[in-house]
UniProtKB/Swiss-Prot annotation:
Subunit organization: Homododecamer.
GO terms, biological process: amino acid biosynthetic process; aromatic amino acid family biosynthetic process; chorismate biosynthetic process; quinate catabolic process
Catalytic activity: 3-dehydroquinate = 3-dehydroshikimate + H2O
Pathway: Metabolic intermediate biosynthesis; chorismate biosynthesis; chorismate from D-erythrose 4-phosphate and phosphoenolpyruvate: step 3/7
Annotated binding of substrate, by residue: 75, 81, 88, 102-103, 112
Name this protein carries in UniProt: 3-dehydroquinate dehydratase
Similarity remark: Belongs to the type-II 3-dehydroquinase family.
Entry function: Catalyzes a trans-dehydration via an enolate intermediate.
Keywords from the UniProt entry: Amino-acid biosynthesis, Aromatic amino acid biosynthesis, Lyase
GO molecular function: 3-dehydroquinate dehydratase activity
Catalytic residues identified in the record: 23 (proton acceptor), 101 (proton donor)
Organism annotation: Stenotrophomonas maltophilia (strain R551-3)
EC code(s) of this entry: 4.2.1.10
Amino acid sequence: MAKLLVLHGPNLNLLGTREPEVYGHTTLADIDQALAAQASTAGHAVESLQSNAEHVLVDRVQAARNDGTAFILINPAAFTHTSVALRDALAAVAVPFIEIHLSNPHTREPFRQHSYFSDKAVGVVCGFGADSYRYAMDAALARVRVAGA
């Protein structure tokens, strides 16, 4: 059984009510519940954490190095375009990760079109709403099976 970590960045606690025309009506609790079921069906465990505080996410990424986390799925949200600290933490722990976005940042404002994470990620899944998480989990589960975790 592998342990997967799902990290949600700032404002994602407002999913379902914040700009539903951009982010949809699915709540973060709905997403976390679906991911836990998806991983459990495959025989794996998921831990999810949402924080509006950069240091909380950095601390959790650093802890992943020693707690048996096999894979990280992260929606850095607004930190996508600003957080060198979170990027450096992900690079330092060397746990593979997938970057996730509900919307497609490449079709949005210019400042949203650059990611500090994409070049370090195994892959990026964006633009499919809440399904972006499901697709990313599919990819992560395939990779932990291949790795024998």
